[in-house]
C-alpha cells in the first residue's frame, strides 16, 4: 500500500508538470496569435492606402527638375488627401531616383514595382524612361509620363503608359513655325545622341526640309562636354541662319556662350529641356534674345498665381518649368482612380484613356495612342534674365 501510494503521488506530480508545460505553450500560442492578428489589422490598414510611385531625377545635373516634379505631385496628393482621399482611401507617395540615367532608371522602376505601387507618375528624360516601359508594361502598372516626350516612347508603349507632355513631333512643328516666322532658311541642328534630343533633332530636320528649309549642319555632342569649339566652327562655316539645340540646359548654355564668343550672330533656339533658371545663369548675357520652346510654366499660365505662391511658401523656391504639369498629373491620377472606383490597375488604365481633366496647364485628353491630343508648347524669349512670352 505504501509503495503504491508513493508511485501514485509521483505520477500526479508528472501530470502537474505536463499541465504547466501545456498551459505555457498554449499561452505562447495565444500571444503569437494575438500579435499576428494585430499585424494583420495593421497590414490591412496600410493596404487601404493607395501607394503612388514618383520616378524622377533626384540626383545628377537635372536634380532640380526632378525635385520640382516630386514637390508638385506631392502638393496635388496632399490636396486630394485633405478632401478625404480617393474612394475613401488616402494616397501615399513614394519616390524613386532615376537620375536621368537608363541603368539607374531600371533599378528605380524595379524598386517601385516590388513595392506594389498602384500607379506611377514622373519621368523627365526620355532616355531613362524608355527602358522602364517594359518593366511597367509587364507589371500592368498605369504610368503617366510628365516630362519625357520622345516619339520612341509611343512606339514602345504597351498600352499602360500615357504622355501628359506634348510629343517630339508637336515640338518639331512649333520649332518650324518659329523658324519660318523669324525668316530662318538654313539651320544647324545639334543634339547629344540620347533618345530625347536625337528624336527631336530628327523630327525637326525632317519637318523643316518638308517646309522648304535647309539643314546647313547636323552635329551630335556628348553630355557633359565643356568645349564646343569644333561644333561652333562647323556651324559658323555652314552659313546657318540659326542653331537649334535639342538637348538639355547645361550643354545648351555652354554652346550659347561659345557661339556668341566666337561671333555667331544668328538665331539660337532651344528645345524644352532648357527651360531652367540655370540655363540663364550659365549663359549670362549671351542668353539674351535666345528662343525656347516652352512647356506650360507657372509664369505663362494666368490661372497659376495661387499655385505659384503656395509652392514658394511650401518649398522656399520658385516653381520650375514642369511644376504646373506635374501638379496636374498628380490630380489626374487621383481623378482616374476615383472614376475607376477601385485601385484595380486595369480599371485605372481604362479611366485614364477616357480622361477629360482640366488642370493648371490646360486640358488633358489622350489620343488612341495615349498621347496628349493638343500641343502645349509655345515659344518664349530670354529678356532681362527671364523667359517671357513674345
Whereabouts are the PLM-identified features?
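Extracytoplasmic "Venus flytrap"
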Residues: 53-74, 96-103, 124-127, 190-198, ...
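An alpha-beta-alpha
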Residues: 58, 160-223, 242, 333
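Extracellular/periplasmic bilobed ligand-binding domains
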Residues: 201-293
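Hydrophobic alpha-helical segments within soluble ligand-binding/sensing domains
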Residues: 105, 163-186, 198-199, 226-229, ...
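Extracellular/periplasmic periplasmic-binding protein-like sensory domains
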Residues: 256-327, 382, 386-389
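Beta-alpha junction/loop-to-helix N-cap segments that form part of ligand/metal-binding clefts
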Residues: 64-69, 85-155, 222-228, 249-251
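Segments of small-molecule ligand-sensing domains
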Residues: 313-323, 334-389
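Periplasmic-binding protein-like
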Residues: 112-124, 144-146, 188-191, 239-249, ...
Amino acid at each position: 500500500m505504501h509503495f503504491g501510494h508513493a508511485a501514485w503521488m509521483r505520477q500526479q506530480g508528472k501530470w502537474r508538470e505536463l499541465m504547466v508545460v501545456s498551459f505555457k505553450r498554449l499561452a505562447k500560442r495565444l500571444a503569437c496569435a494575438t500579435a499576428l492578428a494585430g499585424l494583420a489589422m495593421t497590414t490591412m490598414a496600410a493596404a487601404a492606402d493607395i501607394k503612388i510611385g514618383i520616378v524622377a531625377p533626384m540626383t545628377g545635373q537635372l536634380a532640380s527638375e526632378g525635385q520640382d516634379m516630386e514637390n508638385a505631385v506631392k502638393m496635388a496628393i496632399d490636396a486630394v488627401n485633405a478632401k478625404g482621399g480617393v474612394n475613401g482611401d488616402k494616397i501615399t507617395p513614394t519616390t524613386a531616383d532615376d537620375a536621368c540615367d537608363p541603368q539607374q532608371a531600371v533599378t528605380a522602376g524595379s524598386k517601385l514595382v516590388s513595392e506594389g505601387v498602384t500607379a506611377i507618375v514622373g519621368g523627365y528624360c526620355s532616355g531613362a524612361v524608355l527602358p522602364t516601359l517594359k518593366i511597367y508594361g509587364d507589371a500592368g502598372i498605369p504610368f503617366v509620363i510628365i516630362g519625357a516626350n520622345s516619339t520612341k516612347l509611343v512606339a514602345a508603349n504597351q498600352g499602360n503608359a500615357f504622355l501628359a507632355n506634348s510629343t517630339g513631333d508637336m515640338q518639331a512643328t512649333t520649332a518650324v513655325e518659329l523658324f519660318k516666322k523669324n525668316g530662318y532658311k538654313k539651320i544647324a541642328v545639334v543634339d547629344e545622341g540620347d533618345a530625347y534630343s536625337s528624336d527631336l533633332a530628327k523630327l525637326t530636320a525632317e519637318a523643316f526640309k518638308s517646309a522648304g528649309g535647309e539643314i546647313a549642319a547636323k552635329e551630335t555632342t556628348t553630355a557633359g562636354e565643356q568645349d564646343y569649339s569644333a561644333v561652333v566652327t562647323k556651324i559658323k562655316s555652314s552659313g546657318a541662319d540659326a542653331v537649334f539645340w535639342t538637348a538639355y540646359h547645361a550643354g545648351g548654355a555652354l554652346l550659347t556662350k561659345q557661339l556668341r564668343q566666337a561671333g555667331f550672330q544668328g538665331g539660337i533656339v532651344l528645345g524644352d529641356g532648357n527651360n531652367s533658371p540655370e540655363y540663364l545663369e550659365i549663359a549670362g548675357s549671351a542668353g539674351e534674345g535666345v528662343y525656347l520652346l516652352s512647356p506650360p510654366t507657372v509664369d505663362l499660365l494666368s490661372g497659376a498665381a495661387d499655385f505659384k505662391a503656395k509652392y514658394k511658401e511650401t518649398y522656399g523656391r520658385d516653381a520650375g518649368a514642369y511644376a504646373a504639369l506635374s501638379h496636374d498629373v498628380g490630380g489626374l491620377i487621383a481623378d482616374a482612380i476615383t472614376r475607376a472606383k477601385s485601385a484595380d490597375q486595369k480599371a485605372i488604365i481604362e479611366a485614364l484613356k477616357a480622361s477629360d481633366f482640366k488642370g493648371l496647364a490646360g486640358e488633358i485628353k489622350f489620343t488612341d495612342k495615349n498621347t496628349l491630343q493638343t500641343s502645349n508648347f509655345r515659344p518664349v524669349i530670354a529678356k532681362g534674365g527671364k523667359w517671357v512670352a513674345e
